[in-house]
């Protein structure tokens, strides 16, 4: 029977070919890709950007819940939040503090840091531009970091260690893409803090340690008090994540956590804690990130929704960390 159907299929295909009709395949071969295979079409962000003015908070909540189940694995109670992840999303929808916008904007954050703890802790700025066409790449140093100010994560920042080896056209295209209005971090999962950020491209001095390694110390502050620090190390190979409590003892809130109680405390740890708590004081929750070089520390960024509120924590830790957040009064 299969042979008969196969024969009929061949005959029909030949007849269609005679009359110039092409039978489309369900799965066509992947076409050859150009050498610049980087075009990114963020469908959901574009849809949210086009339609956000029509959305109600209930519809935004529905959208977050769909992403949450897909990425975290349980259905979140955003109306009566208990876990860390749930409370992050509650604040995204209900706590619209303008100071958060100042702090998530990687350009305006520099003034907030300078005013509150000192300009010596700000990563030095090389330049700021409103569009990629304004950047004179020839004038930039051999090493630098360049980023768009209204997003977080590696998609919005680029590290250049040797300018002679970069593809400037590729970098320009990436930066131009990240400046598009739908790339605003708000349209990913409705984190309000980003919504009113004015997009800019900034270049900063390249920060490094003498040994080439640069650890990232992410300090989690609840009500302005440090509870724990996430250390990201070995970023040039396979990144390791260590969670340290206030006594610098390891704990494992997720399956990715590495337990190593021999990992050294940064030599300027106490100063980091003091600065983190001062910068985070106005907020119910905030994470303050630091870099430590040979003899200096810098504030890298401040974030209010780690991993966009889709963290893969063990439930006991999701609940415990959630209990440390006292929800504020709503601010529309």
Where are these regions (language model features)?
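Membrane-proximal basic amphipathic "stem/tether" segments
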Residues: 1-94
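A short, surface-exposed helix-loop junction/capping segment
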Residues: 83-98, 252-260
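Active-site nucleotide/adenylate-binding loops and adjacent lid/helix of ATP-dependent enzymes
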Residues: 94-96, 100-213, 223
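Beta-strand scaffold of nucleotide-dependent catalytic cores
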Residues: 146-147, 215-232, 240-243, 298-303
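Short, surface-exposed beta-strand-loop junctions and turns on beta-sheet-rich folds
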Residues: 152, 235-237, 305-307
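A short, polar/proline- and glycine-enriched secondary-structure boundary/capping micro-motif
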Residues: 157-159, 238-244, 309-313
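A long amphipathic alpha-helix within ATP-dependent nucleotide-binding catalytic cores
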Residues: 194-200, 243-297
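C-terminal active-site "lid" helix and adjoining low-complexity regulatory extension at the edge
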Residues: 292-332
């Amino acid at each position: 029977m299969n042979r008969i159907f196969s024969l009929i299929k061949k005959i029909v295909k030949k007849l269609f070919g005679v009359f110039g009709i092409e039978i489309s395949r369900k799965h066509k071969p992947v076409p050859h890709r150009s050498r610049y295979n980087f075009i990114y079409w963020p469908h959901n962000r574009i849809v949210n950007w086009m339609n956000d003015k029509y959305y109600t908070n209930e519809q935004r909540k529905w959208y977050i819940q769909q992403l949450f189940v897909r990425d975290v694995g349980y259905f979140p109670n955003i109306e009566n939040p208990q876990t860390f992840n749930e409370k992050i999303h509650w604040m995204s929808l209900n706590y619209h503090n303008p100071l958060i916008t100042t702090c998530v904007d990687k350009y305006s954050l520099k003034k907030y840091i300078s005013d509150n703890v000192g300009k010596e802790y700000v990563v030095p700025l090389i330049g700021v531009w409103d569009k990629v066409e304004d950047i004179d790449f020839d004038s930039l140093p051999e090493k630098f970091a360049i980023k768009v100010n209204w997003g977080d994560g590696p998609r919005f920042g680029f590290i250049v260690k040797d300018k002679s080896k970069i593809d400037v056209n590729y970098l320009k295209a990436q930066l131009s893409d990240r400046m598009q209005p739908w790339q605003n971090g708000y349209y990913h999962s409705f984190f309000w803090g980003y919504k009113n950020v004015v997009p800019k491209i900034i270049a900063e001095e390249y920060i490094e340690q003498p040994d080439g390694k640069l650890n990232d110390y992410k300090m989690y502050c609840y009500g302005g008090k440090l509870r724990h620090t996430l250390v990201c190390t070995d970023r040039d190979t396979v990144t390791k994540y260590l969670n340290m409590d206030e006594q610098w003892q390891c704990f494992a809130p997720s399956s990715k956590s590495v337990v190593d109680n021999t990992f050294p405390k940064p030599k300027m740890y106490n100063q980091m804690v003091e600065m983190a708590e001062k910068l985070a004081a106005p907020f119910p929750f905030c994470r303050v990130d630091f870099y430590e070089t040979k003899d200096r520390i810098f504030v890298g960024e401040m974030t209010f929704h780690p991993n966009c509120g889709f963290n893969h924590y063990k439930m006991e830790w999701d609940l415990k960390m959630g209990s440390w957040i006292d929800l504020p009064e709503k601010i529309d």
